[in-house]
Each structure stands twice: as structure tokens, then as C-alpha cells.
Amino acid sequence: MTLRCLEPSGNGGEGTRSQWGTAGSAEEPSPQAARLAKALRELGQTGWYWGSMTVNEAKEKLKEAPEGTFLIRDSSHSDYLLTISVKTSAGPTNLRIEYQDGKFRLDSIICVKSKLKQFDSVVHLIDYYVQMCKDKRTGPEAPRNGTVHLYLTKPLYTSAPSLQHLCRLTINKCTGAIWGLPLPTRLKDYLEEYKFQV
């Protein structure tokens, strides 16, 4: 991963999302830097990106939440940009998001990494796993061998999402054919900016 903090964050750890950049020329961003910037803009539109937050703050936010509730925050580990904090049956836990070669994936042990799906954006990664959990979870399962099932079902918003964004999510859940809808072009452009269901 070729990320560096552009300015000190004051907490001895990492910077906030706006402080991260890629190594290279400041005048003309590389294609990878442009992809990362686009992915972070998308993440900023979600309403469930919390920015700089400690592990303990994330645990406190998720403590009373139902199982499957999640948020995205800046990672406290300098080798990672972001972390998913999620409420499991055993309490809140954290999972790092790896960014490498212009792709995002969940961090895992080496023997499994090559099998994990990679995504162009964090929101696409989260959307994929939310849909996968929705399809696979039919009822409460008893964990085997001390394992804990991790489900991503519902984001924890920083504040109430706008009505526009909620409508966009509903439309995305109903159809993927935005340009076939009887809507003004400007509205279709708005819907096209965020094509996810979560």
C-alpha cells in the first residue's frame, strides 16, 4: 500500500480521510490516486463513515446496537486506511480494510487473502457483503467451535440521512435501470452518482 499522511494528525496515529494521499506528483494525480479519491468521495456520501475514531469510541457507539450494525472509521493501524467496526453476537469487533493496487478487500490471513473478492471502492465492498449476508442469513445460528459469525446488515449513521439519499437508496434497491426511468436527466445523474443499496 502506498499511502502516507500528508500532515500530522496530532494523535500519534493516522490522519483523517482528508489527510491521506498517495505518493507521487502533487500537480497531476496518478490514475490510482484518482480512483482512491473517487472511492473516498463515495464513502463520504454514505452517512456511515465516521472518520477519526478510536477503537473504544467505536465499541461505545455499537454497544447497544443490534447484531450486524456496522460503521466505517479511519484505521488506527498505520498500514491501513479504514476499518469496519461491527456488532457481533460476542460484542463489537473490528476488521481492517486493505487497499492495494487500486483495490479494496477485507484483511485476512495470508492463505485466504487471494480468495477474497476485491473492489474498486469501499462502498462497493460493503454493499457486496451486506447483500451476501442478507442472502445467507435465514435465522440465528449457533456458533461452532467458539467462532463468531460476522454479519453486516445495517449501517450506523453519523446523523439522519437526507430524504434525497434515502430515496436514492430505495430506487437503487428497486431497479438498476436508472436511465429507463421517466425522470429528468439531472435527477438521473444524481442517482448515477451513488449506485449502491446501502
Swiss-Prot record:
Ranges for domain SH2: 48-156
Protein purpose: Substrate-recognition component of a cullin-5-RING E3 ubiquitin-protein ligase complex (ECS complex, also named CRL5 complex), which mediates the ubiquitination and subsequent proteasomal degradation of target proteins, such as EPOR and GHR. Specifically recognizes and binds phosphorylated proteins via its SH2 domain, promoting their ubiquitination. The ECS(SOCS2) complex acts as a key regulator of growth hormone receptor (GHR) levels by mediating ubiquitination and degradation of GHR, following GHR phosphorylation by JAK2.
Record carries keyword Lipid biosynthesis: no
Residue stretches spanning the membrane: none
Gene Ontology cellular-component terms listed: Cul5-RING ubiquitin ligase complex; cytoplasm; cytosol
Notes on how activity is controlled: Substrate-binding is prevented by the covalent inhibitor MN551 that cross-links with Cys-111. Also inhibited by a MN551 derivative, MN714, which contains a pivaloyloxymethyl that allows cell permeability.
Consequence the record notes for mutating residue 96 to L: Decreased ability to bind phosphorylated substrates
Region (Disordered): 1-29
Region Interaction with AREL1, annotated ranges: 1-75
Protein name, per record: Suppressor of cytokine signaling 2
Effect of residue 94 to D: Decreased ability to bind phosphorylated substrates
Entry keyword set: Cytoplasm, Growth regulation, Isopeptide bond, Phosphoprotein, SH2 domain, Signal transduction inhibitor, Ubl conjugation, Ubl conjugation pathway
Tissue specificity: High expression in heart, placenta, lung, kidney and prostate. Predominantly expressed in pulmonary epithelia cells, specifically type II pneumocytes.
Induction profile: By a subset of cytokines, including EPO/erythropoietin and CSF2/GM-CSF.
Keyword tRNA-binding included in the entry's annotation: no
